[in-house]
Amino acid sequence: MGRKLVRQFRYPMRWLSFLASGVPVILVFPAPSLSYLAWFALVPGMVLFTRAATTREAVARGWWFGAGYLIAMLYWMAPEIGPGLVLLGAVMGWMWSPFAVAVHKLLRPGAPWWRPLAAFIVVPSCWLIPEWIRSYQGLGGPWDLYGASQWQHPAVLALAAVGGVWLVSVALLMANVALAVLLGAIRPAWFRPAAGALAAPAIPEGKGAPAVSAAGRLARPAVALAAFAAAAGSGPLAFALTAPFPASRQIEVTLVQPGVVNNATQRTDASETLTAALSKDGTLAVAKPDLIVWGESSIPDDLTGTSAADQALLKQIETLSRADDAEILADQDTTPPGKGHEKWAVLVNPSGVQGIYVKTRLVPFGEYIPFRAQLSWLTSISKAASSNMVPGTGAHTLTVTSPSGATAPVDVGVLICFESAFPDMSRVETGQGAELIVYQSSTPTFQGTWGPDQHASLAAIRAAETGRPVVQAALTGDTVAFDARGRQLAWLGQDDRGQVTVPVDLPAQADKTFYDQAGDYVMWSGVGISVLAALVMLLRRRHFLANTTGAAGGRTAEYDADTGNPVRS
């Protein structure tokens, strides 16, 4: 079995073309943001999988496809992990093999009618497998989940309020399956293995296969078109049927983006200057902020420390908070006594530090190296973390209050940078009573790449999922704000410098989306369906295995479970 699978990786140029087939799919994400392609971008890959002569070849093709997709998706991480990116793609590409096998088994020409129908459920479920596996921090985190490509379309994102980003992925996959079924009905030759490939021959009508009537030939295109319409219309329908949560009140949030400043002290000075400008340029007369958010790693000192430098910086921020009558959420890298290196979000008002959140989900290779004992060599050829940071104990809210008491307290869910990729963290904070989700970010290593734009777009997904407005203040990268349905309120791009004050409508703490309450049921349903489909496939395969009589050495032949024809593997 192992040798047969390895043989599928022969002929390098041929398989490099399958590697390349996964690359164009990333155009659906920022910065290109060709989101409309997501509705059909997977069809070419599906054609390649159905043209595989055997299941093993489909496994290999899916592996190559996944490797190309993953490497292209994370190309901007090359400075962090160097050649480790290629290794990551090669090792993790297998996750797309179940998807390839499902397509190969269910969308081949001549398959019985029930297989294309099953494909509408099984294929999207198998696509969720790599998205589910990657959702674990140690395996890279759920970056560029397929549903996240729709971040610019609040009507489609309405599905996220029902089933998270996973349900948006399912709708997109169903649309791709529908187009593949339609194309297979119109041009079946495109889906057949290449001439000379060893595969089960199709049975001509009248010789073991039932005759297909004219009505039957029209059924598949009709079903495919109906399924595509249902998938494409599901988001707008959900958007129309679910009214937005009524605003319990409105607050003003100022997001500060100093831009690329390499010196740590100068970074703090830049944030302070932009914050001080609020009370000097008349901004407060127009829109007085209730909260001011600085970016990740915005200060070099420990605001809880006792040194003269620590206390001096704390006094400066307290003075700014008093002048603007708003609490300031800063961010620092710190090493508490007796602990390792941590990253803190620190809430400050004129009376001092009011709350701290410690970053829980750390960036693989950027803030720690998984399996450091085995992969420490990456530090000598890349910018991978020289030492592992220590994670916090979990997400929790901070309570923002007005120094003058002019506005009522606001419970805010505070998360840092990479944590915006994880749907569960913002959902946990919403469950704890968060009325607003705040992210602090800094992406200087990736400035000028697609990475910061992809990162910022995730705020729209988290807003739609939780029914909470989401803001992100970036030291470098993109500073953004979205309302509770994922509609864009503000965007400062990678080359921008300044501050923006955004009015955000806060829902009542008791208001929850269905996804807030039900959790990741779509993802777990997909995993269950995939496992069930795999069991069915294995049982049918076992039932139709037979020993070929008279074959030298007693070779075993595999028979197709539906046609009874031998399949050469």
Question: What are the residue ranges of the model-derived segments?
Answer:
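Active-site catalytic loop in hydrolytic enzyme cores
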Residues: M77-I81, G110, S135-G163, E342-P423, ...
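Short, conserved active-site loops that position catalytic residues or coordinate cofactors/metal ions
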Residues: F29-P44, Q257-P258, K288-T304, A434, ...
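CN hydrolase (nitrilase-like) catalytic-core segments centered on the catalytic cysteine
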Residues: I81, M92, P124, I299, ...
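Membrane-embedded alpha-helical bundles of multi-pass enzymes
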Residues: G2-A240, G448, A459, A474-T479, ...
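Short conserved micro-motifs at the rims of enzyme active sites and ligand-binding pockets
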Residues: T265-R267, Y368, T449-W450, Y515
